[in-house]
A protein has these predicted regions:
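Carboxylate- and glycine-rich phosphate/diphosphate-binding segment that chelates Mg2+/Mn2+
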Residues: 88-200
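Glycine/threonine-rich beta-strand-loop-alpha-helix active-site module
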Residues: 6-13, 17-120
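Short beta->alpha junction loops
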Residues: 1-5
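Glycine-rich phosphate/pyrophosphate-binding beta-alpha loops
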Residues: 83, 191-224, 319-325
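Predominant activation on well-ordered alpha-helical scaffold segments within soluble catalytic domains
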Residues: 9-12, 36-39, 135-143, 159-170, ...
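Flexible, glycine/charged-enriched surface loops at secondary-structure junctions
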Residues: 148-157, 172-185, 200-205, 243, ...
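Gly/Pro-rich interdomain helix-loop hinge
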Residues: 215-218, 222-306, 348-349, 354-356, ...
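Short, amphipathic C-terminal "tail helix"
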Residues: 305-384
């Protein structure tokens, strides 16, 4: 479950009562993230959550100075699932239950003092958690490698982790309670992926997954899996020719970067475009292999509910902290389009509403169409 600000405040209150000098965060990403916020509120009860959640362009040059951590308690993170990498990252994702907004907090003060990677804690993880966590780690690798803040150091971690996941996630999924080697490899891969994105940061896939999960209560790893194909295709497009977000990032070269990933995984094609398709196909096979369904609609069957919340979900995804490091900066219309494509599993195009005298039912199959009367358009699914 998504940790809430209220639960973190309640935990911090208990800490203030007995004043620990060491905090051990034992659990998956949600438990570790909640513990990080408890740690902050325990050491600095005066800290304002919205100040800490303030967005920034560069984590090293932010307007808000995060409070100094570690003066009261040492923080130890012990993951029990192989996915989030929170044990080695300066991030904590928390949901404000009063608004439903999911905030990814980021500052190097949130980095745990120690991480203990012990496979014994992973052996009883159920298949669903193994799959969702594993694909979350895949998205960490791909977004860190494509990030405009990627370096030689993060590249090596991301590539090695990704190759390990492709090899060992199916084994951990099938025989997780007995295959110690697969669990150990996945635990190490998730931590390596965490080290990669702790320095290179993430992108719009995570921005969209944060909001998809918050609005429709989809597990975070599944939400990333559902958006991954669309984001890869979006990032690999050859436009725009120039990026202006970071001056040191001359222009997008993401297609080439994805082709390098494909080559490292043994999926090289005749050219970069074919390598990209090979990579996407391999990702789809891996997701299906571990039981992840292909579309948002498989998890959110209420079409009208999804469409009713689409605009606000799009706005919040655009404003998410992770969007800034994406190699191609998206427009809100492009984020919305990716959500729609991921929902229906097809490419969509908006068309004018039919004339009043024309029966929409005669022209459009409502299983493959959506209506938004207030905007005066309908969207029709198109096969790729």
């Amino acid at each position: 479950p998504d940790p809430t600000l209220a639960s973190a405040k309640a935990g911090a209150k208990q800490m203030l009562d007995f004043k620990p000098d060491c905090i051990i965060a034992l659990g998956g990403g949600s438990a570790m993230d909640a513990a990080k916020i408890m740690w902050v509120l325990y050491e600095h009860p005066e800290a304002d959550f919205m100040d800490m959640a303030m967005r920034f362009m560069d984590i090293r040059k932010r307007i808000y100075t995060f409070p100094k951590m570690g003066e009261k308690a040492y923080f130890i993170a012990v993951p029990t699932s192989a996915g989030t990498g929170s044990e080695v990252t300066p991030f904590a994702v928390i949901t404000d239950e009063s608004t439903g907004v999911k905030y990814p907090l980021a500052d190097y003060e949130l980095l745990p003092d120690m991480a203990i990677i012990d496979t014994d804690f992973h052996m009883t993880a159920p298949k669903g958690l193994t799959a969702a966590s594993g694909i979350d780690a895949v998205s960490h690798c791909l977004e860190a490698y494509a990030s405009m803040m990627a370096t030689d150091y993060t590249d090596g971690l991301a590539l090695k982790a990704l190759k390990t996941i492709f090899e060992y996630l199916p084994m951990a999924y099938d025989n997780g309670q007995t295959d110690v080697v697969a669990r150990e490899k996945m635990a190490n891969a998730a931590t390596m992926a965490g080290m990669a994105f702790a320095n290179a940061f993430l992108g719009v896939c995570h921005s969209m997954a944060h909001k998809l999960g918050a609005f429709h209560h989809i597990p975070h790893g599944i939400a990333n899996a559902l958006m991954l194909d669309e984001v890869i295709r979006f990032n690999a497009a050859e436009v725009p020719n120039k990026m202006g977000t970071f001056p040191q990032y001359d222009r997008p070269h993401t297609l080439e970067r994805y082709a390098q990933v494909a080559e490292y995984l043994g999926l090289k094609g005749k050219n970069n475009a074919e390598s990209l398709e090979n990579l996407i196909h391999a990702l789809d096979k891996l997701k299906a292999r571990v039981g992840i369904k292909p579309t948002i609609r498989d998890y959110v069957p209420d079409e009208q509910s999804f469409l009713a919340q689409l605009d606000e979900m799009t706005r919040q995804a655009f404003d998410d902290q992770c969007t800034g490091a994406n190699p191609r900066y998206p427009l809100m219309s492009e984020i919305k389009q990716m959500y729609l494509n991921a929902y229906y599993g097809k490419s969509f195009k908006e068309e004018p509403l039919p004339d009043a005298g024309e029966s929409a039912d005669d022209e459009h199959n409502f299983k493959q169409a959506y209506r938004r009367e207030k905007s005066g358009v309908i969207g029709t699914a198109k096969e790729d």
